[in-house]
């Protein structure tokens, strides 16, 4: 990543990247995004409850000596989905390696050849642009057009 971004900006980018990335089984073997997205969504649902339970059980059993450890466990549990969103945010702003950049250009060309309007091809695409192109390809291209890549 050539340009440093702040933590809050990276978390927001991660949230939007979770929505943009196409959740398709064909992409599982190539990209780790789907596994990270699945774990992050699970963490968003479950980890606040884990954090609350870890603190409340110590309080319910009057075990106030272990409360500091329970608070550390709660903070760790709450930080897990944030770590996933941070990773996704920094990944979305990372420039594509040359092989993936050429794949991005091929997909972009294939979509524009079929008559669909797209924004101009980026000179140095990022994973964010690849996600948009993959989404568009899965929605608008037929299976025979996608056979070459998947």
UniProtKB/Swiss-Prot annotation:
**Record's InterPro entries?**
UPF0208
Keyword annotations of the record:
Cell inner membrane, Cell membrane, Membrane, Transmembrane, Transmembrane helix
> Per the annotation, which location comes first and is thus the protein's main one?
membrane
Mind naming one GO cellular-component term on file for this protein? plasma membrane
- Membrane topology category: Multi-pass membrane protein
Location(s), subcellular: Cell inner membrane
* Similarity annotation: Belongs to the UPF0208 family.
Task: State the protein's name.
Answer: UPF0208 membrane protein VIBHAR_02941
Organism expressing this protein natively: Vibrio campbellii (strain ATCC BAA-1116)
């Amino acid at each position: 990543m050539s340009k440093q971004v702040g933590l809050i900006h990276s978390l927001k980018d991660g949230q939007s990247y979770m929505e943009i990335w196409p959740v398709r089984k064909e992409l599982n073997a190539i990209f780790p995004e789907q596994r990270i997205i699945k774990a992050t969504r699970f963490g968003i649902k479950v980890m606040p409850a884990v954090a609350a339970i870890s603190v409340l059980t110590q309080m319910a059993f009057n075990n106030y000596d272990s409360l500091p450890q329970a608070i550390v466990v709660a903070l760790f549990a709450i930080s897990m989905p944030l770590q996933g969103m941070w990773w996704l945010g920094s990944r979305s702003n990372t420039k594509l390696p040359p092989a993936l950049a050429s794949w991005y250009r091929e997909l972009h060309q294939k979509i524009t050849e079929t008559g669909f309007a797209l924004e101009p091809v980026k000179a140095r695409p990022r994973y964010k642009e690849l996600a948009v192109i993959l989404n568009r390809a899965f929605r608008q291209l037929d299976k025979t057009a996608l056979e070459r890549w998947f």
